[in-house]
Curated annotation (Swiss-Prot):
Organism (species): Budgerigar fledgling disease virus
Result, substituting T97A: Complete loss of VP1, VP2 and VP3 expression
Full protein name: Avian agnoprotein 1a
Biased composition (Low complexity): 137-161
Stretches for region Disordered: 1-85, 116-176
Amino acid sequence: MSTPARDPNTAGTAALSPFSTPNHELRAPGPGEAHSPFTPTAAPGSQPAGSLSDPEDGPDPTFNFYIQGHRRRPYDRQNRFGKLESEIRETKSQLETLRQELKHLQADVDDLKETVYAAGTSTASTSVPPSQPNSPTPTATTPEASPAAPTTESTETTGPSVATNATEPSESRPAR
């Protein structure tokens, strides 16, 4: 008996790689067979693990990436950019709303400042601040000691003094 002749192209490859097979053993896997020697064989009548129709694993993501990816990318990009554009529009509208609220709040703050200012000027004109009492403070020099010094009694009136009005804000100040 003679042994079958081996293909000269594959002669010696078994010694180089433990995973190589002779050409006559290369064939498509049959039903129920594994696709490679590294995956376990499935039971007869069922799909191998990780196949496209496996209900537990869902569709194989590599299939979509390699086979259909070139057709889906432009749509995905448009969809992604459309979502980004809608988020930008929404953010701009929120920003504009916040700007309007800020303007209203600034107007309210200005109104409150005017109210406080008006209340402060009305009480300042009727009452004397504690830093400036009604009676003149005695100085170190008395009018008798230095007759050349002017007296404050001659310039004082019944209302607030001129010097007091100069330091306080006047009521005729224009409103903002």
